[in-house]
């Protein structure tokens, strides 16, 4: 056998071992009765490049185990040492061993090769390498183990905090803690919610009238404006008049805002399809060049599907799946119940005691207010993450599965957002697509600058955030509106920092701090204390 090991950083030839005649008795033991037979007929040959070399004919009974052991031992940084074991001039001694060698199965690795590969003269340091945690190599390494460690530590710490909370305060959750008897008696809000489908039906009638050319385009726009405005103001009037509980009011306002957004998309899309149909009839545009259905038609079935589908952007047809996975739906429903319970536990056991034992963040001691905000930030973040998972992942996917709705990109990887602007583009895809389709690009097509178009989009978002929170709480101090509009300077700041430092980790940490650690807990405290002050005055 010729065994050669050629180090990368040395210019000398490999070490050549010359073994005496008949002196290479290599014996291996895998079991007590299993041995390796070594042929004594070895011949010396001369290598024209490196001098002397030894060629041996070795017959091994169990070579697969030895090969795997030798390969594992020869690995250094993912690259194996160049250990070559050749057998030339195969010798037959009456058995089939010579035939196997002649057939190409003579390249085997044994423990002798490993011993020669790691001789003291072989260099151990062959190239320049960085430490895994150095600044140049840390982002090229896999940190799955550290991630698992963080999860273990997080579970351990939170388990201790839960046990400590239960020992200190006891079980604070009451039966029916989210659905009180008063919320069940809010029948005006329930009736208002049940009558909301009247507005999509009215919009369909208007579209049918314009399709039959009974009314002109300006009349269509006026009627749609009245319908969409009434769909939003009607629930606001009912909530303010009935003085309902906050949860019932928030639910109704969310439904009303969704209906308004869908009606605007329905109206805008049909208007654009009518304009395209006229252009096609005139020959200005070819039907094949448009990614839309032609001829233009109004279908009640498409409107009904759109009103219940998990999307805010209307189109006549959607990508559909082949079937409904019933077992998958059941699993998601179980997850939805579990995470809703976790969210309720955190609210009752942590958030409510913290806000009850706090003072108004804009009044009193500044350090005490900062301490309350930071103490509230962690449970508030957990609730917000549970809310996101329950609604955007579980509920919307359940609804999409039941309706066989194909496009289920309800969110993207917003947790990796490097700027506030990127976060708003990733975390709520139904609203983002609606904003881009019906606010942002229409503004650009009408000559409005990009910065002003972004400002208008944030302004619309701020109005709806204020409606969904201020109306059910009966508090109109514009805290939610100001919070959303403050995102505009944060967009500029985080974009500037991202362009300056070119570091995604810095931008991501700034996003998490401003949005989840500072902003949301502050809004919770502001609305809670204003709500308690309002209740104190009314009582």
Curated annotation (Swiss-Prot):
Q: Which ranges belong to the motif FYXDWWN motif? A: 410-416
Stretches of Polar residues bias are at: 33-52
- The identity of this protein, by name, is Diacylglycerol O-acyltransferase 1
Function summary: Major contributor to triacylglycerol (TAG) synthesis and oil accumulation in developing seeds. Catalyzes the acylation of the sn-3 hydroxy group of sn-1,2-diacylglycerol using acyl-CoA. Has a marked preference for oleoyl-CoA as substrate.
> What are the subcellular locations of this protein?
Endoplasmic reticulum membrane
- One GO cellular component from the entry? chloroplast envelope
Question: Family per UniProt?
Answer: Belongs to the membrane-bound acyltransferase family. Sterol o-acyltransferase subfamily.
Q: In which pathway does it act?
A: Glycerolipid metabolism; triacylglycerol biosynthesis
**UniProt-annotated stretches for the region Disordered:** 1-104
The GO biological-process annotations, alphabetized, read as: glycerol metabolic process; triglyceride biosynthetic process
Q: How does it sit in the membrane?
A: Multi-pass membrane protein
């Amino acid at each position: 056998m010729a065994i050669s090991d050629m180090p990368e950083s040395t210019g000398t030839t490999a070490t050549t071992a010359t073994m005496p005649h008949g002196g290479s008795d290599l014996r291996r033991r895998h079991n007590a009765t299993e041995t390796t037979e070594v042929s004594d007929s070895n011949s010396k040959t001369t290598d024209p490049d490196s001098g002397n070399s030894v060629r041996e004919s070795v017959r091994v009974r169990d070579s697969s185990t030895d090969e795997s052991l030798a390969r594992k031992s020869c690995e250094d940084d993912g690259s194996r040492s160049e250990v070559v074991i050749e057998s030339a001039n195969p010798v037959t001694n009456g058995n089939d061993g010579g035939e196997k060698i002649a057939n190409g199965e003579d390249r085997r690795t044994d423990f002798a090769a490993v011993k020669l590969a790691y001789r003291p003269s072989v260099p151990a340091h062959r190239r320049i390498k960085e430490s895994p945690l150095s600044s140049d190599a840390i982002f090229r390494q896999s940190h799955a183990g550290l991630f698992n460690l963080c999860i273990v530590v997080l579970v351990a710490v939170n388990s201790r905090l839960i046990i400590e909370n239960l020992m200190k305060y006891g079980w604070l959750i009451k039966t029916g803690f989210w659905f009180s008897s008063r919320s069940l008696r809010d029948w005006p809000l329930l009736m208002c919610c049940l009558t909301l489908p009247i507005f999509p039906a009215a919009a369909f009638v208007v579209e049918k009238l314009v399709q039959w050319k009974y009314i002109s385009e300006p009349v269509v726009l006026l009627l749609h404006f009245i319908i969409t405005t009434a769909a939003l103001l009607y629930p606001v009037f009912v909530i303010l008049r009935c003085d309902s509980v906050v949860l019932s009011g928030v639910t109704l306002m969310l439904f009303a805002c969704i209906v308004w957004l869908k009606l605007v998309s329905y109206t805008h899309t049909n208007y654009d399809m009518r304009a395209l149909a006229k252009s096609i009839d005139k020959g200005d545009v070819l039907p094949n060049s448009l990614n839309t259905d032609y001829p233009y038609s109004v279908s009640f079935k498409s409107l009904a599907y759109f009103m219940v589908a998990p999307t805010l952007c209307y189109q006549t047809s959607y990508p559909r799946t082949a079937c409904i996975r019933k077992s998958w739906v059941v699993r998601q429903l179980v997850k939805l119940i579990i995470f809703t319970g976790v969210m309720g536990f955190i609210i009752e056991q942590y958030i409510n005691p913290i806000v009850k034992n706090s003072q108004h963040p804009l009044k009193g001691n500044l350090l005490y207010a900062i301490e309350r905000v930071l103490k509230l930030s962690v449970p508030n973040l957990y609730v917000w993450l549970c809310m996101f998972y329950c609604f955007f992942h579980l509920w919307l996917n359940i609804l999409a599965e039941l309706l066989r709705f194909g496009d289920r990109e309800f969110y993207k990887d917003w947790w990796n957002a490097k700027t506030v602007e990127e976060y708003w583009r990733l975390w709520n895809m139904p609203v983002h697509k609606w904003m881009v389709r019906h606010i942002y690009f229409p503004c650009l097509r009408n000559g409005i600058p990009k910065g002003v178009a972004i400002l208008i989009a944030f302004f619309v978002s701020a109005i709806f955030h204020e409606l969904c929170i201020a109306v059910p709480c009966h508090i109109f101090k514009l805290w939610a509106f100001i919070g959303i509009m403050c995102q505009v300077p944060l967009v500029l700041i985080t974009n500037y920092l991202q362009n300056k430092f070119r570091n995604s980790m810095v931008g991501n940490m700034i996003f998490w701090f401003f949005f989840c650690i500072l902003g949301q807990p502050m809004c919770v405290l502001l609305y809670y204390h204003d709500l308690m002050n309002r209740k104190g005055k009314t009582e």
